[in-house]
Amino acid sequence: MSKATLQRRPLVKKILDGADDNLLVIAGLGSPNWDITEAGDRPLNMPLWGGMGAPVGMGLGLAMAQPTKRVLVITGDGDMLMSMGALATVAAQGPDNLAICVLDNEKFGETGNQATHTSPRNNGPTDSGAGTDLSVIAKGCGIADSAMVRDQAEVAQLVKDLRMKKGPVFRVVKVMVEKLDFVMPPQDGAHLKDRFRQALLGSA
């Protein structure tokens, strides 16, 4: 079982504290959606309700289309495992305004907390994963600035890196398994797209 001590909601709140119009946020489905909404719903948040595996590719495209903006992708380990190939494309394109934060609780939280491949190998029936280290995979894909964060002492630097450091930046943050209330963003996908577009580009 993970020995993580970081709580995801306070962490995401710190990451997004003081977010302005320069910060564009893409959140993977499920818990990252609830996390960014708990921190404060805003038009320049784009929560992906059902797009498992999509946030990194979407974040890359947005970073390339909006090079003067900071693009932050916040997603989970299950989602990132589904779209690892996107990391090689991020490395190939090398956008300096893109940061990716994977909140890794070693579980598929939306389907019953089954172990993901990032959980330890042969550690009992609820944690029988492969010990996959997504930060090592990102580095192997060519993202040089890739690291794992485990401790509260590392959080202040994590926030600075995600918000300001030249990208692409990739961080895996080990977080606790918690049972948290859902804090729902708007559920209409067309509305989310339209308000994001208007906030970013203005009225057509």
Annotate the PLM regions.
Residues 1-2, 17:
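Helix-loop-helix hairpins and the membrane-proximal interhelical loops
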Residues 3, 7, 27-28:
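Short, contiguous, pocket-lining structural segments
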Residues 5-14, 35-194:
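Thiamine diphosphate
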Residues 12, 19-24:
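Extracellular glycan-recognition modules
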Residues 22-42:
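Acidic-glycine-rich active-site phosphate/pyrophosphate-binding loop
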Residues 198-199:
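A short, surface-exposed interaction/processing loop segment used at functional sites
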Residues 202-204:
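Charge-patterned, long linear interaction tracts outside catalytic cores
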